[in-house]
């Protein structure tokens, strides 16, 4: 398990953009992390005031950060950054609301030089909330 302090060492994100609370499982090419979604998230002020729903784009950002923790924790990538290069086949299946625990899985399926492709999914209570293929570049 990787706690929030180690996550903050790996990722350059700060509040309110740090969207990974804990890593539950990690292997060479796969990572499982969680985000506790609370009513105190700043985006709920405007999305939507009377019906708070986590924006889908932030779910995808949380998935990208999950993959980033795995990649940036590697010795050869310390001090580098991960940049979005693309998203494909993104689907949103379930609304994510305050009180949900978002379980995020990212699996690296292809690497070529500084480019990586990840299959990612986010679930709430075992039900798929979002999924997609993320492409990113590692750089500084």
UniProtKB/Swiss-Prot annotation:
- Assign the protein's first listed, main location to one coarse class: cytoplasm
Q: What is its EC number?
A: 4.2.1.59
Gene Ontology biological-process annotations? fatty acid biosynthetic process; lipid A biosynthetic process
Q: Does the keyword Cytoplasm apply?
A: yes
The terms under GO molecular function for this entry are: (3R)-hydroxyacyl-[acyl-carrier-protein] dehydratase activity
Q: Which ranges does the record mark as transmembrane?
A: none
Superkingdom of source: Bacteria
Entry's localization field:
Cytoplasm
Q: Which GO terms describe its cellular component?
A: cytoplasm; membrane
- Which reactions fall under this protein's catalytic activity? a (3R)-hydroxyacyl-[ACP] = a (2E)-enoyl-[ACP] + H2O
Q: Which InterPro entries match?
A: FabA_FabZ (IPR013114), FabZ (IPR010084), HotDog_dom_sf (IPR029069)
**Keywords noted in UniProt:** Cytoplasm, Lipid A biosynthesis, Lipid biosynthesis, Lipid metabolism, Lyase
**Residues at the active site:** 47
Task: Give the matching Pfam families.
Answer: FabA
HAMAP family according to UniProt: FabZ
Role noted for this protein:
Involved in unsaturated fatty acids biosynthesis. Catalyzes the dehydration of short chain beta-hydroxyacyl-ACPs and long chain saturated and unsaturated beta-hydroxyacyl-ACPs.
Per the record, the similarity remark reads: Belongs to the thioester dehydratase family. FabZ subfamily.
Q: Give the protein's recorded name.
A: 3-hydroxyacyl-[acyl-carrier-protein] dehydratase FabZ
Q: Which organism is it from?
A: Streptococcus suis (strain 98HAH33)
Question: Which gene is transcribed and translated to give this protein?
Answer: fabZ
